[in-house]
Amino acid sequence: MVSEVTLDKSRQMYEKAKTLIPGGVSSPVRAIKPYPFYTASADGSKIRDLDGNEYIDYCLAYGPAVLGHNHPVIKAAIKEQLDKGWLYGTPTELEVTLAEKVAGYYPSIDMLRFVSTGTEATMSALRLARGFTRKNKFIKIEGGFHGAHDAVLVKAGSGATTLGEPDSLGIPADFTKYTLQAPYNDIETMTTLVEKNRDDLAAVIIEPVLGNIGPILPLPGYLKELRKLTKENDVLLIFDEVITGFRLAMGGAQEYFGVVPDMTTLGKIVGGGLPIGVFGGRREIMEMIAPSGAVYQAGTFSGSPCSVAAGIAVLDYLKKEDIHAKLNSTGDYMRAVVSEIVEDEGLDYTVCGIASMFKIFFGAEPHNYQEALKCDKEGYLSFFHRMLANGVFLPPSQFETNFISAAHSEEDIEKTLEAYVENL
């Protein structure tokens, strides 16, 4: 067992970066303590830092790299588009092709709009829900992460939880006065909130699986009861599938659990690793978006040709090669073996996950945000560093999900499991 890894070049780069970039990183989840490693390259299941260290990667850019890094099929699609130009400011045939493919997999989507990020997707979806319903309020789940726009940064997951900053300075109270919250997996509290506010309640937005505070899974029947509740009260249901979309199945969580929302947001995988976001829904809702309707949304890079080309390539490959069968089988295997390791060691830890998402929780299995907060964050961080020293890169936060890619080999999996045995 290796006790530490040499990161001299990364440390030097971090010292320089801190003088130019706040915190030395471009997103707070990358701010590994005492300093992050800086990536030089990545290929397949491996990622390499400036010091030449190589790691088996289960972070996978926080989800998008479902085929692994630098996949030849995606790279070929991007190169082909680069030869034709990479930004036009006009519609393209490619975006129509990708829109048709996405709508074919998601029964909740009759029409959709491309944006550049998941944050834009959820921000636009909520604006549209309010515009369509002529109502102001919405409900989000405690610990649900829907990007970094003002209305949703209330008890959000992801880096905000890790840093102990569930809210953010710079957001006037008036911006969130229409943001209501309910605990995950608590249909009784949700029912009370919905029924009390239904006259001015536009939508409920939810990650079907809480991916930035776990993963935490829905209890049996929870999503179906939520769907029934929102329908009965004339409230839109929005599934934020930025993480679960094309991850659990081609049709995401709504296919996996058999629940169809009114609107869906997507990101990460659907762009093949390039910047993209999608929001879509029923035709009568989506036709409210400009220029068809009076709800405004626009973006210079929306429908970016390279992102769309990469998206077409990854979706076609996932379907043709039946990738989800392998991914989900590997996920089942890893969760089972790590659970055995935890039991054999007599540890009070829990292995959580679904499909190709998994995580070891340093505490009891959580079913909501408040239960997740009881975990041993410092204990997990120490474990993260031990795994990194032994060539396994897990997300540095207790609250970020591990992902499996199609590039992870049997050898990768067995080496990883050996590292779990040695470092738990």
From Swiss-Prot:
Cofactor(s) listed? pyridoxal 5'-phosphate
- Gene Ontology BP terms: protoporphyrinogen IX biosynthetic process
Cited HAMAP family: HemL_aminotrans_3
Question: Which family does the record assign?
Answer: Belongs to the class-III pyridoxal-phosphate-dependent aminotransferase family. HemL subfamily.
Keywords in alphabetical order, please.
Answer: Cytoplasm, Isomerase, Porphyrin biosynthesis, Pyridoxal phosphate
**Tree of life domain:** Archaea
Species whose genome carries this gene: Methanosarcina acetivorans (strain ATCC 35395 / DSM 2834 / JCM 12185 / C2A)
Cellular component terms, GO, for this chain's entry? cytoplasm
GN (gene name): hemL
Q: Does the keyword Isomerase apply?
A: yes
Q: Which PANTHER family does the entry mention?
A: GLUTAMATE-1-SEMIALDEHYDE 2,1-AMINOMUTASE (PTHR43713), GLUTAMATE-1-SEMIALDEHYDE 2,1-AMINOMUTASE 1, CHLOROPLASTIC-RELATED (PTHR43713:SF3)
Task: Please give the PROSITE patterns that the UniProt record associates with this protein.
Answer: AA_TRANSFER_CLASS_3
Pfam families cross-referenced by the UniProt entry: Aminotran_3
Which residues does the record list as N6-(pyridoxal phosphate)lysine (modified residue)? K268
Please report the name of this protein according to its UniProt entry. Glutamate-1-semialdehyde 2,1-aminomutase
Catalytic activity as recorded in UniProt: (S)-4-amino-5-oxopentanoate = 5-aminolevulinate
Question: Pathway it belongs to?
Answer: Porphyrin-containing compound metabolism; protoporphyrin-IX biosynthesis; 5-aminolevulinate from L-glutamyl-tRNA(Glu): step 2/2
TM regions (residue ranges): none
Q: Which cysteines are joined by disulfide bonds?
A: none
